[in-house]
Structure formats: C-alpha cells, structure tokens
C-alpha cells in the first residue's frame, strides 16, 4: 500500500456529527430520488464561496454522476479539486449553490481522523452511541445491533476493549460499525487510510469491501482517496479536476485514464 501515492494528502478535517440529515439550500436542492437502483446521484451540482471582497469563487462546477446501489465507489483527484467539498454536500454538512442531489437514507459520514468520531471509553459503548436517539429501542436490540455491526467489520472479539488500546485502523472500523448499527444505506468515507500504516490500511479497505459484498445491495460506500492503488478494490470511481467531474465509470476504466494522464505529464516534463 506504500506504492503509488496519486496525490498529496490533505490535513485532517473536523466535523461535529456522526449521523447526518440532508438540508435544503435556497438554490441547490436535495431530491427524494431520481431513479431506481441508484444510491447517490448529482445533477449539475455547483458550489461557490464568497471572499471578503464579495467575489464569488467556484469550488464545484456543474458536477454530474450517479452511483449504483450496493457498490463501493471512490472519488479521486488532486488536492483542492473539490473532493471533500463534494462529500460534505452529499452528507448534508454543506448546501450546494445550485443543482440537485440525491443520497439514499439513512446515510453516515466517517471522518478522516477516527479520534474525531470514536469518543466513548469502550468499543461496545462507541458503536452503541448513535442508537441513543432511538428511545423505543430496548437494551437487547441495542446489543444485537452492536454485535452485528462489529461482526460486519471483523471486530466482534473487540467488543469490551478500551478504545485507547486500538490502532488507528481498528478505530476506523469501529467508526464504520457505529454507522452500520444505525442501519445506514450509504457510507460517506473521507480519506480513511491517509494516516494509517500499511497493515491498518488493508484492514480498513478489506472491512469496507467485505461489508459491501456481504450486504448484497443494501449498503453503498463512497470513499474519497488520493491513493491510486486503492482503486483496485472499488467497483467504480469519480475523477475530479478543478472542481469538475472529468470522468466517472467502472474502476478499471478510471484507473487507465489516470495512469495515461500521469504518463503524459511525465513525458511533457521530460521533453
């Protein structure tokens, strides 16, 4: 996993919520659904910010793509291309300036830095944390959900472990289990392997891939990454540059496209 780092990693970002609900902006909108068998879809999505001088700076420009249900997709592109902003909009943390968005619910955001999300003293308590809002759920059902979620990410035997004894990759898997315990349909994953060692990187990727395969269409994952070698685990990908979706489709096609761009760039430097 140390191989080809496609783009430089960005620093960690902190968001305040684990489970996120969509909101609606005055211009952009969140749709109930565009079509069947689609978990995520954007149409002509734009997002801009204003400077102190009142100048509008575009961050996302006319982005359109769709992700089928039950698949693992990745978003790749250079630093500053809009990957994380796009993920925040899909999560409902940021409203689009214009365009339309559909993300199947429930959806959950898993942070780049697990220490921003995994905060309870034990594994069991942390995975159960998000279930506290379901006041009609008894303790037996809570425990059953926690066990099933931990089994899905290969962490069942860690249920009583203190959080501080876990590695970074294990904490990421606990964060994913917390999302699964809430029966989420879409996982939004922000550069989960950026600060992990090789063993932890593989553990997290395998957990997500195994989860998607085991759920058989019930869970979809969208993973922001800067590592080209991670793309081989995906079903499809979105490649971005300068706030635009340049290509989207099956993982092999996007991988070939990126490698061709890299080769062309190297040839230009050498000429």
From Swiss-Prot:
GO terms for cellular component: chloroplast envelope; chloroplast inner membrane. ATP binds at residues 77-84. Keywords: ATP-binding, Nucleotide-binding, Transport. Gene3D superfamilies: P-loop containing nucleotide triphosphate hydrolases. One of its GO terms (molecular function) is ATP hydrolysis activity. Residues 40-267 form the ABC transporter domain. CDD domains: ABC_cobalt_CbiO_domain1. The keyword ATP-binding applies. InterPro entries: AAA+_ATPase (IPR003593), ABC_transporter-like_ATP-bd (IPR003439), ABC_transporter-like_CS (IPR017871), ABC_transpr_CbiO/EcfA_su (IPR015856), Molybdenum_import_ModC (IPR050334), P-loop_NTPase (IPR027417). Belongs to the ABC transporter superfamily. ABCI family. This is ABC transporter I family member 10. The gene is ABCI10.
């Amino acid at each position: 996993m140390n191989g080809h780092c496609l783009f430089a990693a960005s620093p960690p970002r902190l968001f305040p919520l684990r489970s996120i609900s969509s909101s609606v902006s005055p211009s952009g909108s969140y749709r109930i659904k565009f079509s069947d068998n689609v978990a995520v879809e954007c149409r002509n999505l734009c997002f801009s910010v204003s400077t102190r001088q009142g100048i509008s700076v575009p961050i996302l420009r006319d982005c359109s793509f769709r992700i089928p249900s039950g698949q693992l997709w990745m978003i790749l592109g250079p630093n500053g291309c809009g990957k994380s902003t796009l993920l925040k909009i899909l999560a409902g943390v940021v409203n689009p300036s214009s365009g339309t968005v559909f993300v199947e619910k429930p959806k959950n955001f898993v942070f780049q830095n697990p220490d921003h999300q995994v905060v309870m003293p034990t594994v069991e308590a942390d995975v159960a944390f998000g279930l506290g809002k379901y006041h009609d759920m008894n303790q037996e059902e809570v425990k059953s959900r926690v066990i099933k979620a931990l089994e899905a990410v290969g962490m069942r035997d860690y249920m009583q472990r203190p959080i501080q004894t876990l590695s970074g990759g294990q904490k990421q898997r606990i964060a994913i289990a917390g999302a699964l315990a809430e029966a989420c349909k879409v996982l939004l994953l922000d550069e989960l392997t950026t600060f992990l060692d090789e063993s932890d990187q593989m553990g997290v990727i395998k957990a997500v891939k195994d989860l998607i395969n085991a759920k058989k269409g019930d869970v979809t994952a969208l993973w922001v990454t800067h590592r080209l070698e991670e793309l081989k685990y995906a079903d499809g990908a979105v490649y971005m540059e300068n706030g635009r979706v340049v290509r989207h489709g099956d993982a092999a096609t996007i991988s070939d496209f990126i490698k061709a761009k890299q080769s062309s760039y190297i040839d230009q430097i050498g000429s």
